[in-house]
Amino acid sequence: MNIQALLSEKVRQAMIAAGAPADCEPQVRQSAKVQFGDYQANGMMAVAKKLGMAPRQLAEQVLTHLDLNGIASKVEIAGPGFINIFLDPAFLADHVQQALASDRLGVATPEKQTIVVDYSAPNVAKEMHVGHLRSTIIGDAAVRTLEFLGHKVIRANHVGDWGTQFGMLIAWLEKQQQENAGEMELADLEGFYRDAKKHYDEDEEFAERARNYVVKLQSGDEYFREMWRKLVDITMTQNQITYDRLNVTLTRDDVMGESLYNPMLPGIVADLKAKGLAVESEGATVVFLDEFKNKEGEPMGVIIQKKDGGYLYTTTDIACAKYRYETLHADRVLYYIDSRQHQHLMQAWAIVRKAGYVPESVPLEHHMFGMMLGKDGKPFKTRAGGTVKLADLLDEALERARRLVAEKNPDMPADELEKLANAVGIGAVKYADLSKNRTTDYIFDWDNMLAFEGNTAPYMQYAYTRVLSVFRKAEIDEEQLAAAPVIIREDREAQLAARLLQFEETLTVVAREGTPHVMCAYLYDLAGLFSGFYEHCPILSAENEEVRNSRLKLAQLTAKTLKLGLDTLGIETVERM
């Protein structure tokens, strides 16, 4: 149930009846303060200006045409021409009832789209580090939300599995006579990469062999392809352990590495030349873009093929967008890549659009994100100044959570304690990131993320168990409760009900903008409203059974909404804490 959409349409029709143009925007928003009702229509200002009348006068005319019978109990004009809408308690009660009767909590499914989501993108022969965390978990929250809404989501893990370094790695593998690479673990591979690089830099004969191997690998030689595949397999097996620990839905089947697009690259360069978009410049093949200017104010040249015939990341990204539209039939493509890549992507996509590879009707969206910083405000590093491995970070999260929950539950059985520590520790790391606006940098702080108060995973997980405990104490018959009516008489009941019914609106924003922090803020607010409701509206000691059952149903919908909302974020819930 999307109340905002329902009210927007009603207000729009009333505005048109009052003389506004057909494309008028009612600007219906959730009210920021209780005294302004549940929703506010702010569109009178802009439209009144166009019509040459006072906004308040337009608002008065709109009200004569606005029929919110059975939806609103009161509609009033505030200030210069805002329309405040107060929802009818009977309307709220009816829709709470409907939400409880539905597995989807009353959330409608929009028109189904095929949506490709590009996220995570680790590199082969390197261990995942904290720099991969944001893309992986923000992208996965977007994927879960879009799938819940009924879209066909294609996860695209754009793994760095190609490039000149593979000649070096294969040459080193051969030199060490470690053809049985399947038994190597990635921890060895990290050292293996360093040793290979050292030899490459210091031993010219080795470097020459490595360069030859790149050519052989790129020409499709089966022996070198087999060695390359071993390196990819070891890496992805290790990465899968990290994905599973993070409760992320990526699997090996979602890998669409850079190498996938190699066969397309010569054809794309030839096509861009044929279309007059690419030209020869100093031996390289370049596309000049008027939209981007260099320091001299001239169109910027984007190289798509080097003098030596090699291709660049831009060429791969052009092929990648083309493939996602032509082969995967995407209606929309989302890229969870950090903000430093923005200009690079914009240039690749400008070429994609000019060449007609992806029509304007298919959005290519860069859902960029900021950096993860330490308490000193600098990029998050180990004490020695090195890159923090993701596995080490998760180990520490688990260890800290283990101490925290053991302190609070000294008598809990060990296996249950371990499960709880895992849910709290991993949940804390993920939620700390997801609850921040992705476009900004954020400070990584163990104490804040593991706190039981504030907008944190432990607080949200605890809020969920608290609602469940009400049910355990009530010893309620589920069937009897299902048949009981919902009655809303108190203000706090109405506020909680209205917020519960805004779940679909929240999902819609996350799906449209790729902003999981909006869901975190909604759930945190919901938990706070439930707390106030629980304090002021007795449930178990309510004045009669009818009121008790009605309040239990509000509690029931709160628990279901918290669980489902946290699930769209990839945060585990527990029954007891």
UniProtKB/Swiss-Prot annotation:
Keywords: Aminoacyl-tRNA synthetase, ATP-binding, Cytoplasm, Ligase, Nucleotide-binding, Protein biosynthesis. GO terms for biological process: arginyl-tRNA aminoacylation. SMART domains: Arg_tRNA_synt_N (SM01016), DALR_1 (SM00836). The keyword Metal-binding does not apply. The keyword Membrane does not apply. It comes from the Bacteria. It holds the Pfam family Arg_tRNA_synt_N. It catalyses: tRNA(Arg) + L-arginine + ATP = L-arginyl-tRNA(Arg) + AMP + diphosphate. One of its GO terms (molecular function) is arginine-tRNA ligase activity. GO terms for cellular component: cytoplasm. It is found in: Cytoplasm. Monomer. Belongs to the class-I aminoacyl-tRNA synthetase family. This is Arginine--tRNA ligase. It comes from Escherichia coli (strain SMS-3-5 / SECEC).
